[in-house]
């Protein structure tokens, strides 16, 4: 392993120590919580920073696995318009990633969804079996 790969692995492990990044792929519906920092200037001229969290929910149409620069593209429909946003997987701005639904698709990149609307843009849902535990058997 060369120095750059070692450096990337250190940064990825630092990022994943605080937040768990779930396994997801193209076709899955995810809810990404993003940290937003607002700057406002008070009357006395001082700058005030406020943090807030904003949720962005949509379908993952592309995923790019490239170490520390990994990213994924999420598409949602907002007020009748398609909105796409790319998130860096290991960015400190991304507070959490939650998988809402797992989808069944046959492609790695779902760019064809840009040209579709309504029923033709739907994705089948993949049902994941729940692990059997001792409590479930009893």
From Swiss-Prot:
GO terms for molecular function: structural constituent of ribosome. Keywords: Ribonucleoprotein, Ribosomal protein. This is Large ribosomal subunit protein bL19. PANTHER family: LARGE RIBOSOMAL SUBUNIT PROTEIN BL19M, RIBOSOMAL PROTEIN L19. The keyword Ribosomal protein applies. PROSITE patterns: RIBOSOMAL_L19. The keyword Signal does not apply. It holds the Pfam family Ribosomal_L19. Belongs to the bacterial ribosomal protein bL19 family. GO terms for biological process: translation. It comes from the Bacteria. This protein is located at the 30S-50S ribosomal subunit interface and may play a role in the structure and function of the aminoacyl-tRNA binding site. InterPro entries: Ribosomal_bL19 (IPR001857), Ribosomal_bL19_CS (IPR018257), Ribosomal_bL19_sf (IPR038657), Translation_prot_SH3-like_sf (IPR008991). One of its GO terms (cellular component) is cytosolic large ribosomal subunit.
């Amino acid at each position: 392993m060369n120095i750059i790969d070692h450096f990337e692995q250190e940064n990825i492990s630092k990022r994943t120590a605080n937040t768990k990044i779930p396994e997801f792929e193209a076709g899955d519906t995810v809810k990404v919580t993003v940290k937003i920092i607002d700057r406002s200037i008070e009357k006395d001229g001082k700058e005030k920073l406020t943090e807030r969290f904003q949720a962005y929910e949509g379908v993952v149409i592309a995923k790019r696995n490239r170490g520390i620069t990994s990213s994924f593209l999420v598409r949602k429909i907002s007020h009748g318009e398609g909105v796409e946003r790319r998130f860096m997987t290991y960015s400190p701005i991304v507070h959490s990633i939650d998988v809402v639904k797992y989808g069944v698709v046959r492609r790695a990149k779902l760019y064809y969804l840009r040209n579709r609307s309504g029923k033709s843009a739907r994705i089948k849902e993949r049902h994941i079996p729940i692990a059997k535990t001792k409590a479930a058997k009893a």
